[in-house]
Amino acid sequence: MGKTVIKDTFREIKGSFGRFFAIFAIVAIGVSFFAGITASSSDMRYSSDSYYDEYNLFDLRLLSDAGFTDDDIKAIRETDGVKGVFAAHEADVLTTIGNAQVTVRVMGVPEKNRADDNEDYINRLRLKEGRLPERDGECVVRYSDFYDGKVDIGDTITLRSGDEKDISDTLKFNEYKVVGLVYTPYYASYDIGQSSTGSGKVNICIMVNDDCFAGDYYTETFVTVDGAKQLNTYKDKYFSCVDDVKVRLGNTGTKQIEARR
């Protein structure tokens, strides 16, 4: 019985070899494609995790409607499990490029101690061209293909508020000279995000020395977690490590709110 089935099978293949070969080729291509996708996904995760570690991407981003004071930052730094802390400012404003109104996200970067061994230098910039800001009134632009050639080194960007407030309420200067083009791990894709300013979509991101911001309160705080860099960003152990510190920081925040009252 078994030999008969085998003979019939080979007879069918021989009688319609073209159809058999086509089906075989389709299956082989599908299996090869699936195997390649399966292998490449793990490689991509490994590469991105290494990139995040190299440029010290934040593990936690803290936001507060009331802002952060120096006392708040001290309390965050003293929370068990916290490794690096960078208190910064961020604001969405407007500018004009050509004849178009453009929404600009302005982010603060450390003015001093940008060394790679400084754990508080979080979301480190990778310079593509030019240099980093060294004085007030200078900025670097996040490089993207869309604005390549439209905003370049040597250009001056004039900023204005997107609401009834004056720009001086947010920034000490309204003009910034572009001195460099950079990549940042904070934005892994070309999409920067949404905004309540302008058209609703952020078109361009610039970084200035954090001291260029006006106001007494930090708008956001980036935190790295002790031991998290040794773990794979996409694994459960990483999320467990970060979540433990997240809970502690929540308790720290509650205490700081009570202290302000």
Where are these regions (language model features)?
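Membrane transport/envelope proteins' first extracytoplasmic loop
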Residues: G2-R261
